[in-house]
């Protein structure tokens, strides 16, 4: 039941009811708010991780996908939701070796990549900063934060990225859009796709 599934993830009665209500809608139907959107992403990523072997995957441009549901005026609630989301990303490592008989991956950990910021995501600044604050609360290995910057990046983003890199050590990688995007275009990638590149695997750029 939705209530049973929700109670696995949430202890507070109000959170359980909120999660149960979201599970009546997502992921079968479109999300209706920020909470149900994040819940839908988590459920799909957890299932895909089990099915495909539980090893190295990325959320693509999750900030842009969640942006239509994000209200900067309610960033405190959004940060709490994202904190729970990032915590759960550390619960699914290594399951592929047990659950996928066709492609078992005997790994003790799964690397998950979350790309934030950069060209084409300027309107997501408040949400991206919220993600970083949540990561600083969690301070666990996953997801790996792939933080995009360019010379025109907002100073608040540059400072927040520098702080995250200092505080979270190996969890943060910085990517230079001014170098990567022109090179992706030179390799034949359409400009729109190059603008929204993300990371998959240790250092592979994809769209």
Feature-to-residue mapping (PLM):
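Conserved catalytic cores of very large enzyme subunits
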Residues: 1-207
């Amino acid at each position: 039941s939705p209530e049973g599934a929700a109670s696995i993830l949430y202890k507070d009665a109000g959170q359980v009811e909120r999660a149960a209500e979201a599970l009546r809608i997502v992921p079968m139907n479109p999300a209706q708010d920020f909470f149900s959107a994040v819940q839908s992403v988590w459920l799909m990523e957890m299932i895909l991780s089990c099915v495909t072997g539980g090893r190295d995957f990325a959320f693509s441009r999750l900030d842009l996908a969640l942006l239509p549901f994000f209200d900067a005026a309610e960033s405190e609630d959004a940060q709490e939701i994202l904190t729970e989301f990032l915590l759960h990303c550390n619960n699914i490592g290594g399951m592929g070796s047990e659950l996928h008989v066709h492609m078992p991956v005997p790994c003790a950990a799964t690397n998950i990549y979350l790309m934030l910021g950069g060209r084409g995501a300027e309107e997501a600044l408040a949400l991206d900063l919220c993600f970083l604050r949540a990561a600083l609360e969690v301070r666990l290995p996953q997801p790996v934060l792939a933080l995009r910057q360019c010379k025109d990046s907002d100073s608040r983003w540059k400072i927040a990225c520098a702080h995250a890199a200092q505080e979270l050590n190996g969890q943060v990688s910085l990517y230079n859009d001014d170098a990567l995007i022109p090179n992706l275009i030179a390799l034949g990638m359409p400009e729109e796709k190059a603008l929204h590149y993300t990371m998959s695997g240790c250092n592979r750029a994809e769209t």
